[in-house]
């Protein structure tokens, strides 16, 4: 399936220029699904005034995005501590009745044990370009998940390394340096038109959003519906 907003000239540039592919850990490598994620959201519903699963999942995603976007390198804290801070701030608002430490354990379980994308193994096997992961959370989570699923990745880069989340360019610039590629030689597959895609763009990296459900039809960013369609457009 072709990217509708691409012309052939842009496709030719991608095919011949791309030397490295970067994937968002959350959303792309591990979609928000699976027993661990469902258990976390269900528990959140039972222990708060968030009325149902969809409402709670949306609240968590959007609130965490806001906290990350409002964070700067001057007041950066790790994702775990940011989530702790978020639930401490919002405890009364959502009438949270469970210990925040239990929330953190459940989030950690999501990051380590959630099922990976059904496409990922095939994507890694077929890609002729090296593939890297960029993550808001510590590298250990992605490393454990990859080992658990017997998958090889060329490297994982955490926002902790640069003390800035993915809405800033620093993590992408760091990833380029470590991967040994120029910005015009990299392609980033992201998850959020308000968080990581703007950061990648600031770093000068060609970026697309993996829009599996068609949620971003009005976005200014290029979209793909699957990782397999990306390989097709890269001539692989």
Spans of features found by a protein language model:
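Short, acidic loop-to-helix structural element flanking the phosphoryl-transfer center
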Residues: 105-132, 169
């Amino acid at each position: 399936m072709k990217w509708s907003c691409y012309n052939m000239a842009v496709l030719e540039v991608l095919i011949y220029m791309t030397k490295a592919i970067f994937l968002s850990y959350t959303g792309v490598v591990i979609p928000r699904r699976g027993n661990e994620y469902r258990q976390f959201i269900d528990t959140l519903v039972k222990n708060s005034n968030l009325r149902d699963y969809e409402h709670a999942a949306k609240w968590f995603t959007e609130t965490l995005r806001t906290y990350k976007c409002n964070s700067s390198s001057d007041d950066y804290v790790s994702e775990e501590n940011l989530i702790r801070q978020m639930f401490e701030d919002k405890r009364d608002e959502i009438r949270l009745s469970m210990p925040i430490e239990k929330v953190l354990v459940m989030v950690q379980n999501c990051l380590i044990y959630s099922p990976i994308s059904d496409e990922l193994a095939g994507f890694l096997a077929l890609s002729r370009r090296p593939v890297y992961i960029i993550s808001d959370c510590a590298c250990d989570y992605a490393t454990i998940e990859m080992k658990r699923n017997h998958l090889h990745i060329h490297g994982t880069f955490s926002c902790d390394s640069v003390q800035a989340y993915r809405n800033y360019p620093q993590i992408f610039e760091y990833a380029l340096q470590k991967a040994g590629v120029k910005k015009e030689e990299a392609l980033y597959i992201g998850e959020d038109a308000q968080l990581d895609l703007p950061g990648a763009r600031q770093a000068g990296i060609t970026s697309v959003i993996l829009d599996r459900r068609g949620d971003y039809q009005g976005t200014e960013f290029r979209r793909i519906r699957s990782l397999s369609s990306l390989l097709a457009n890269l001539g692989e």
